[in-house]
Design a protein with these regions (language model features):
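SDR active-site lid
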Residues: 53-117
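Catalytic Tyr-X3-Lys helix of short-chain dehydrogenase/reductase
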Residues: 8, 43, 48-56, 61
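Active-site loop immediately N-terminal to the catalytic Tyr-X3-Lys motif
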Residues: 31-35
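Active-site helix of classical SDR
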Residues: 4, 40
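Conserved catalytic-site region of short-chain dehydrogenase/reductase
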Residues: 27-29
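Residue(s) in the substrate-gating loop at a strand-loop-helix junction
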Residues: 24
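Short-chain dehydrogenase/reductase
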Residues: 112-126, 138
């Protein structure tokens, strides 16, 4: 938050300025076994939404990208692996995320940008179905 605010005056002087926050699929619905992580990503989502509106008047685009789990050493070496990891993803690479970040920086994209086919489908379901459906989906994906 502090770094984003510190950059604001510099962004105002830039051509086509953009802030791309790293949110997560975990910011769509709280993830069992990952409550703290989900809460932090919900905060990123809220910050993105607020600044997207607030800074638009200054010509600064603020968006986020929302990947599910990414295949990195951190994920591979985790002592605990939540059941949802294997069901929702873990097959995206850092290059996939970098490509989405580049797209967000260089194209006119939505405020929230899901990454990966499975999560894009879940996010679409969340928009068109009652919220109870998202809860049921998360319960199913998180079962042990």
């Amino acid at each position: 938050i502090n770094m984003t605010l510190a950059a604001q005056s510099h962004l105002q002087l830039s051509t086509e300025p953009a802030v791309i926050n790293m949110s997560s699929a975990s910011a769509l619905y709280g993830v069992p076994h990952l409550a703290s992580y989900s809460a932090s990503k919900f905060a990123v989502r809220a910050l993105t939404e607020a600044l997207n509106i607030e800074w638009a008047r200054q010509g600064i685009r603020v968006v986020d990208i929302m990947p599910p789990f990414v295949k990195t050493p951190m994920l591979d070496d985790a002592e605990f692996r939540a059941p949802v990891v294997d069901r929702l993803g873990g097959n995206l690479t850092a290059d996939d995320i970098a490509a989405k970040a580049w797209q967000a920086a260089n194209e006119n994209v939505a405020v929230h940008n899901p990454v990966g086919g499975v999560f894009k489908f879940i996010k679409l379901m969340d928009k068109v179905l009652p919220s109870a459906s998202t809860r049921m989906t998360m319960t199913f994906l998180s079962r042990e």
